[in-house]
Amino acid sequence: MQQEIELILHHMHVENIVETGTRKFYVGTIQKKKCVVSLSRIGKVASSVTAAVMIERFAVDRLIVTGVAGGLTDEVKIGDIVVATSSVQHDMDCRPIFPQFEIPLLDVVTFTCDTTLVEDAYKSCSTFIREELHDFVSKNELQALHIHQPAVHKGLLVSGDQFIGTMPQYEKIRAELPDAIFVEMEGAAVAQVCYEYKVPLVVVRSISDKANAIAHIDFNRYIENVAKYYTWGLIEGMMK
């Protein structure tokens, strides 16, 4: 969502805006470090295109994917942050030709995120939650969204071209990929692109829902008043 990158762009010194493939790529610096920022768009194909352009045209040497996701375990609550250590495309199924979840012709099921980026992201998010969150988001706003004591987690991400918001969808993923702790629609696809190009990646998401139709919040309010500050806190910390 555009709101999720607005705060990054506000703090970024934008030197150039490149438009290609119906996308805008903001080129410049954050805290004097060169970077490129773009809206990935929604879904596996859209985000893969964005990632490929980042790598091919702008020669980025690492990628950070941020945004929101659905939680898949009791421990991962709305308002928490999750850093992916690895990812799987939960809707990839070419059986009987290839095993379920395996990417055809790559012989890969699980894409591992860069360990250094994972640790940097985890530390940045933990510092933000512990020391800076209330500078951006009031306790009253957090309480209104039923966010009480945000935590940071690390674990398996699953991605697919469908919004997971019903109990049958939720239970299917939990049964087939029991180690997964959060779900969204882009990260594992970008991970495949980064795997093929050998570019380090980390995926970091804040939890906006429980992916099971039970716990709901005002999504737009969450994005506008909470999630975008999480995103900026992550980026600011990793750019230090």
Predicted feature descriptions by range:
Residues M1-A52, F58:
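N-terminal short beta-loop-beta anion/metal-coordinating cradle
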Residues V36-S40, K154-V158, V204:
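Active-site-proximal beta-strand elements of phosphoester/diester hydrolases
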Residues M54-D61, Y197-V199:
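Glycine-rich phosphate-binding loop signature in dinucleotide/nucleotide-binding domains
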Residues R62-I64, I181:
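Structural motif
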Residues T73-L177:
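Mid-sequence, gly/pro-rich, charge-dense loop/helix-turn segments that line enzyme active sites
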Residues V158-A213:
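A C-terminal functional module that forms or caps the active site or interfaces directly
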Residues A211-K240:
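His/Asp/Glu-rich mid-to-C-terminal helical/loop segments that flank catalytic regions of hydrolases
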